[in-house]
Amino acid sequence: DEISEEDIETYYNKNEKNFILPTPIIKAVFFILPKNAPNLKEVKKWFKSDKANDQESLEDYCLTHAKKYDKFNNKWIEVKYILNLIPGDFNTLEKEILVVKNIEKEDDDNYYFLKINEMRHEQTLAPLDYVRDEITLILKNKKKLQFENDLEKQINEEGVRKKYVKIY
């Protein structure tokens, strides 16, 4: 039994208080380049740009040269998972991320780039697409429980009707 999009949205809207974010989430692009990677000046230009062709160039470049390349443009991810991959003090980075959309850091071997496209702060309502799977699971479990309760009720009623069962 499939859960409809309408059912999901209705549940979400009626239960917003249950979907408050405990931690910030982002949609972003994250990559790590070795210090000796070619054309770093060009990469930094693409990184700062919002033009589609620059973003394509950046993606092509990263697929070839990056030690790690993650594109979370269509999927929300908790900030802490990305911040753990970037050198520096976690709390300082977490504060910086609230203000700056493009973060560049380095250590002895690598450059770290994080380009934030969308962000939701903690203690705000989670976006529906972030909690959709959770809501679907809740609604499926509710349907299953309702089915089990209805089945038990039917069995009891039939048992009483056919005098297999006496309820005291």
Briefly describe each language-model feature range.
Residues 1-168:
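Peptidyl-prolyl cis-trans isomerase
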